[in-house]
Amino acid sequence: MISFEGIPAIYFNSLFGKSNDEAKYIITGNNRDVNRYKWNYKNISKKLSNKNSKQSIFFEKISNLLSIRRKQKAFHPNASRHNINLGSKIFSFKRTSINKKQTVICITNLSSKIQRAKLNKIYHNWTNLIGSKIEIKNKLLILKPFETIWLSTK
């Protein structure tokens, strides 16, 4: 969702990998309470200072994605987006900068199994902005389970 057009909206609790607060929902019966967990400042500060905690890892990863997004002209809030059909288990679209100088192809494997996608263009010379080198075998892009890549022209 961070790669969609517009300004990313992220629930505060998502920054820390907080699961739904089902206990609060059961007590109140209010659907919105499921994602309204109230953090104690001291508690979250302690968790963030531990680089191995789930909260610290989530915060670091999401902060990194937002930092990468901020530097890409193709992720300008008004840059265009066009869907790309790579199959029912792969969600993909293309973002193009307003000045047409940068294109980013966002591809996500929605399944728990390896997926292969045939790309019409040669993307192996492009840069994956958010991960390691992309894997291409027999002209097919290989995506690990739940993997997301952002392929950029620059």
Identify the residue ranges that each predicted region occupies.
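Loop/helix patches that line or flank the sugar-binding groove of alpha-linked glycan CAZymes
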Residues: M1-V104, S112-Q115
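Short aromatic-acidic-glycine turn motif
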Residues: H124-S132
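Residues immediately flanking
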Residues: N109-L110, T153
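Surface-exposed beta-strand/loop patches in extracellular or lumenal glycoproteins
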Residues: L110-H124
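Short, exposed beta-strand/loop patches in secreted or surface proteins that constitute
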Residues: R81-I84, K133-I136, L141
